[in-house]
A protein has these predicted regions:
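Flexible loop/turn segments at secondary-structure boundaries
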Residues: 1-2, 30, 34-36, 60, ...
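Radical SAM/AdoMet-radical enzyme domain recognition
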Residues: 2-127
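Flexible glycine/acidic-rich beta-alpha junction loops that bind and position SAM and/or redox cofactors
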Residues: 59-64, 121-143, 165-179, 208-214
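C-terminal accessory region of radical SAM enzymes
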Residues: 144-177, 207-254
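Short, flexible cytosolic linker that couples an ABC transmembrane/permease module to its adjacent nucleotide-binding
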Residues: 179-185
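Short, small/polar residue-rich loop motifs at catalytic or cofactor-binding pockets
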Residues: 188-191
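Radical SAM enzyme core and accessory elements
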Residues: 200-202, 239-321
Length: 321
């Protein structure tokens, strides 16, 4: 973690907020190795959210999350994560993991984080790897993953009814409000509204493109110089993908991840079909939870109380005025 750069960046943004008429919100993502008391104090003061990388059970996490000496990180990072979350005093955070072919029973990793470690804001993403890689998810894994998502949804309802709810990022869905149509079709806005900055000052559409010279947008000294690439990303939306035309979930995924599409199809306008299958299942389960809550008076009351305020004006366009 380049903590000095983090501090300087946030301090600079704060110094120009009033002048620019902006409200900057920062999220710190960390694997936990570099967390200190100073980092915790700073993050809890300056960061709207923190994302803490943990793949779940010790043996699962330590399979891939190792330090430079090849040692697993679990035993060192978990106490730091617990300290940070406790110090946040209710401010936003997410435990963010990745599941692979090695742990298609990923609900056990989520339940471990919730029941054994005390975390209740959870996220777990499927790995995106080259086909044939040992960790890559396979077609045979899909039915298992679907069962896991259903198991998770049912367990979340059980926990909610017992008064000990957990949040799963991918089941958060607001059917009453939600984002404007621009956000619904353009997703994360990689390459236009969203960029990755390398330690050397280079600009890329997002962190997954870093190091690929074909996807370098420019640098912090000269700005965006590859305007042709930027314009290509401007057109990277759900309506630019013919395969999305008849998908019922298209306005929830906005066409999916450009980087995943590139890695799967060789084209940022392509469709990563495996990811589509997983995404549709997650939305299906999110809808199932909403229906179950609406049919249970006790759950309906709690759901209304906990409903996220997603209709906040993002300030990106005039359509909300």
């Amino acid at each position: 973690m380049n903590f000095e750069v983090c501090k300087q960046l946030v301090a600079y943004a704060r110094s120009i907020e009033k002048e620019k008429g902006k409200n900057f919100r920062f999220t710190l993502t960390t694997n936990g190795i570099g967390i200190t008391d100073e980092v915790i104090e700073w993050a809890n003061k300056e960061c709207y959210n923190v994302v803490l990388s943990l793949d779940g059970r010790k043996e699962v996490n330590d399979r891939f999350r190792k330090d430079i000496a090849g040692r697993g990180s679990y035993d060192r990072i978990v106490p730091k994560f617990q300290q940070l979350v406790k110090a946040r005093g209710g401010k936003g955070y997410y435990m963010r993991g990745t599941f692979t072919h090695y742990n298609t029973d990923f609900t056990n990793d989520l339940f471990h984080m919730a029941d054994d470690l005390g975390f209740d804001e959870l996220s777990m993403e499927p790995v995106v790897s080259k086909a044939g890689s040992p960790e890559a998810l396979t077609e045979a894994d899909l039915p298992i993953l679907f069962d896991q998502y259903e198991l998770l949804a049912k367990d979340m309802l059980r926990r909610e009814k017992a008064g000990h709810p957990i949040t799963f990022y991918h089941y958060m869905i607001d059917l009453a409000h939600g984002p404007c149509i621009y956000k619904r079709i353009s997703g994360c806005g990689s390459g236009t509204e969203y960029m990755a900055v390398t330690p050397w000052g280079d600009l890329y559409p997002c962190h997954q493109f870093v190091g690929d010279p074909d996807y370098k947008l420019g640098d912090i000294w000269n700005g965006v110089t590859n305007t042709e690439l930027r314009d290509e990303f401007k057109l990277c939306n759900v309506y630019a993908r013919p395969d999305c035309k008849d998908c019922w979930a298209r306005l929830y995924c906005a066409g999916g991840c450009a980087a995943n599409a590139l890695h799967a199809t060789g084209d940022i306008h392509g469709v990563y079909e495996y990811g589509c299958e997983v995404f549709r299942k997650r939305i299906e389960c999110a809808l199932m939870i909403k229906v179950a809550e609406s049919l249970d008076p006790e759950l309906a009351g709690r759901a209304a109380t906990a409903a996220p305020a997603t209709d906040e004006d993002c300030g990106d366009c005039s359509s909300c005025e």
